[in-house]
Amino acid sequence: MKMKETLQLGKTAFPMRGNLPNREAEWQKDWEEKGLYEQRQKLNEGKPTFVLHDGPPYANGNIHLGHSLNKISKDIIIRSKSMSGFRSPYVPGWDTHGLPIEQVLTNKGVKRKEMTVAEYREKCKEYALSQVDKQRNDFKRLGVSGDWEHPYITLDPEYEAAEIRVFGKMAEKGYIYKGLKPIYWSPSSESSLAEAEIEYKDVKSPSIYVAFNVADGKGLLDNETAFVIWTTTPWTLPANLGISVNPDFTYVEVKADGRKFVIAKDLLTTVKEAIGWEEVEVLREFSGEKLDRMTAQHPFYDRTSLVMLGDHVTLDAGTGLVHTAPGHGEDDYIVSRKYDLPVISPVDSRGVFTDEAPGFEGIFYDKANPMITELLEEKGALLKLDFFTHSYPHDWRTKKPVIYRATPQWFASISKFRQDILDEVEKVDWLIPWGKTRLYNMIRDRGDWVISRQRAWGVPLPIFYAENGEAIITPETIEHVANLFAEHGSNIWFMREAKELLPAGFTHPGSPNGEFTKETDIMDVWFDSGSSHEGVLREREELTFPADMYLEGSDQYRGWFNSSITTSVAINGVAPYKSIISQGMVLDGEGRKMSKSLGNTILPEKVINQMGADILRLWVSSVDAEADVRVSMDILNQVSEVYRKIRNTMRFLLANTSDFNPAEHTVAYADLRSVDKYMTVRLNQVIQEIRENGYEKYNFMHIYRTVMNFLTVDLSSFYLDFAKDVVYIEAENDYQRRCMQTVFYQTLVSLTKLLTPIIPHTAEEIWSFLQEEEEYVQLAEFPGYETFTNEEELMDTWAAFMDFRDNVLKALEEARHSKLIGKSLEAKVTVYPNEQIRQLMTAVDADIAQLLIVSDFEVSKEVAPSEAVQFEDMAILVEKAEGETCDRCRSVRQDVGSDEKLPTLCGRCAHIVEENYPEAVAEGFE
């Protein structure tokens, strides 16, 4: 027998390398076959419910790291709630309508004009469902647990029916109307856009100052005077019908370059410098109110423009006189309504001028800018042309500029219930405080919601028209259409005539001949997803309304958070969510937005195939996702090192509890040694910290840091560091060894449970090596925590010891640096303490040499020699330990060789070996 065989060296089949890319897929297959999600739901039946409602990602393209951050975060929360005693179902969803899918089909060569609308929509549906399947597999591969076989999809007939009913209830309350208003219009999409579909980019635009000669100055101004306006959109001048001034501003008539002009007094200096006037003479001044209802000659059309009073006119820029085109601006439209001006919008759906703009017919609006500028110069109306860069709205899908264009659209009248929404915003639990202000301000400042879209792929607006043009939206027609959609899907709208879509025998006074037509516009996709509280939360029996939480990216303040609370308050009077968490964007390692053009994108698939989903999940737990987060392969490699630390620590604990049966060998807390009690209390503190300030506050980064601090500081650097001298050296059933194994096992079980929501694959692998009742850790509950007798006194003692130990380690490091010792086991440490430290040595009640990993330790009452390292409350002398190195424990002992049968062992090891291996001692070791 070899002497090495007398050591209790840990053994485990738990592999050192995770091999996550392969093993995770095996675990996931096993979980699916065993129905673990369903088992967990059944286990928690009758318990309090926590519902995190999934915001539906768009069913198009590969998932990206933003998706991963979002889905993993949700999964961590839902798993932690399930393990905390909540019934926490997860129903994933997909948003499946909208322009991007139409664009994909166009790029694939689908000829929309060669098929019926219904046939085209069927193609859209096929593509959308194929993307759902692809993304579903990708999300499952992240380790996200949920009801993947029964997701909600916005193209599902039952969902579409629920959306129709939401629309109907809003219409019944008088919140739906049709109006001709300037709205965001995307020429590239040929459709209206909601505010949520707008993003801003810097563009270079012309900046022009234009003179409008006075036509009727009401006796105050003559025809030799001109009003000066400033605009960055020359193409809107063909639609000009007025000039707006502020009634409270002071305006001046000035003489410059031999002409007379009217400008706001406070902007005169700015305008003078911008146009380049050398000398300006102020002729007189007057209030804006005096200009009301004067007229000016349009600079190139034979018509006049009306001067109007408007509070929207500011002194921030321009001249204090605002070019007003009712068909191309919201403020323009509002002020023109007060003066009963018509609305002219002389561009079509493609952004091309119509015959309402003589001289520019067939010209794309942006191409008309230089033409109009030249015409103004020709007419003597152009005072200055310049260019400047500014932020301008763009279509968030096509990334191309949008315009304001007046078209007949269907609107939801936010103004009618705006205050109700704002009141509900106040009641929501905002886990990120600034989120409340952000959504509140958006809703406070937003206009009415344009909900109609001139596209094919979406839920049709369930509106009929009578022969006299009257719109028909009644509870009867809405319910009938909803039932048709539930049975056949919304494509039925495009397959049947209006009369076939109405209830049998339906009549209307506006249709004496019984003829009807139907709306061809579809609903804004934000109305689709914004109706999920009705189509999902109220429809699925395992869910609740309102949901406990919505968790999405911060872009959803203008999107899903906004549309959901709008529709819910409109029909239910309450917010659809009790709490909101938002997350930032995922940026590259240098803080730049990820994009194909920069070549800095990282696909989740690549990370999973190279490192494993648990690495990605651990990364999610390591970042403060409330703000923008950074990721790169370097960052992920660092996370991988942390994972390796976790894995190796757990492997050490598994190996050194391989002969430990918790039912037989567990030592009661009261019977543990002081140091083991200390570690038990520390473990309990960690459990409490992770549960209360980590999971319950959705602070994953705090969990990550708490776990790593415990593994690194408490375990690796202290407890496990000296543990080998006990668990390897002592006999199998030694009391000290069983004490430590008790702590090891409790740590294993507790940390495995606590890490399950974050790294479920690895946690399940560890769990398979433990002797616990539950077959899967996912079916277990989180560990509890308690307060122990004399806990505070115990922790104070060990906190003081840790400070003492730090001083010893510093002294040992000095000795190592001076070549006095190599390893710490070569040292003898003598302490010259004050009374407080002397009492501490007694209170610790442990083999202090063992705790410090030195061969000899002594507390001296003598005066410290000069070579001792001085500290505030002690001096420490490090010397070379006297004696020989024991072949078994590697300590330097003076009693090595004291046992003639085992001459290379110290007295302690000789005793252990003789007691437990008498035959080997008799026969002699190899």
Swiss-Prot record:
Pfam families per record: Anticodon_1, tRNA-synt_1, zf-FPG_IleRS
Binding residues annotated for ATP, in chain numbering: 596
Cofactor(s) the protein needs: Zn(2+)
Annotated motif 'HIGH' region, positions: 57-67
Catalyses which reaction(s): tRNA(Ile) + L-isoleucine + ATP = L-isoleucyl-tRNA(Ile) + AMP + diphosphate
InterPro entries on file: aa-tRNA-synth_I_CS, aa-tRNA-synth_Ia, Anticodon_Ile_BEm, Ile-tRNA-ligase, Ile-tRNA-ligase_type1, Ile-tRNA_ligase, M/V/L/I-tRNA-synth_anticd-bd, Rossmann-like_a/b/a_fold
Keyword Metal-binding: yes
Keyword Lyase (UniProt): no
GO CC terms: cytosol
Enzyme nomenclature, EC number: 6.1.1.5
Function: Catalyzes the attachment of isoleucine to tRNA(Ile). As IleRS can inadvertently accommodate and process structurally similar amino acids such as valine, to avoid such errors it has two additional distinct tRNA(Ile)-dependent editing activities. One activity is designated as 'pretransfer' editing and involves the hydrolysis of activated Val-AMP. The other activity is designated 'posttransfer' editing and involves deacylation of mischarged Val-tRNA(Ile).
Name this polypeptide is given: Isoleucine--tRNA ligase
Organism name: Enterococcus faecalis (strain ATCC 700802 / V583)
Gene that encodes the chain: ileS
